[in-house]
């Protein structure tokens, strides 16, 4: 993700409720699990997607802690 894309993503996250943030986090965690499984099986082609999903989860957690 480029810097502008990251800023837009975080801006979008800040507009969501806690429930929506939790839902988005769970979806990304499921995707991360699937990506790790593919990587272990040697089927993952976009290895950078692992890092990107981890960072998105961290951004969601950051926004969640800002609200608290």
From Swiss-Prot:
The record's listing under PROSITE patterns reads: RIBOSOMAL_L29
Question: Matching SUPFAM superfamilies, A to Z?
Answer: Ribosomal protein L29 (L29p)
Keywords in alphabetical order, please: Ribonucleoprotein, Ribosomal protein
Cite the Pfam families for this sequence: Ribosomal_L29
Example GO BP: translation
Task: Tell me which Gene3D superfamilies the record gives.
Answer: 1.10.287.310
GO annotation, cellular component aspect:
cytosolic large ribosomal subunit
One GO term in the molecular function aspect is:
structural constituent of ribosome
* InterPro entries, sorted: Ribosomal_protein_uL29 (IPR050063), Ribosomal_uL29 (IPR001854), Ribosomal_uL29_CS (IPR018254), Ribosomal_uL29_sf (IPR036049)
Q: Which domain of life is it from?
A: Bacteria
Looking up PANTHER family in the UniProt record yields:
60S RIBOSOMAL PROTEIN L35/50S RIBOSOMAL PROTEIN L29, LARGE RIBOSOMAL SUBUNIT PROTEIN UL29C
Question: What family classification does the UniProt entry report for this protein?
Answer: Belongs to the universal ribosomal protein uL29 family.
List the NCBIfam families.
L29
Name the UniProt record assigns to this protein: Large ribosomal subunit protein uL29
* The organism's taxonomic lineage, starting at the top: Bacteria, Bacillati, Bacillota, Bacilli, Lactobacillales
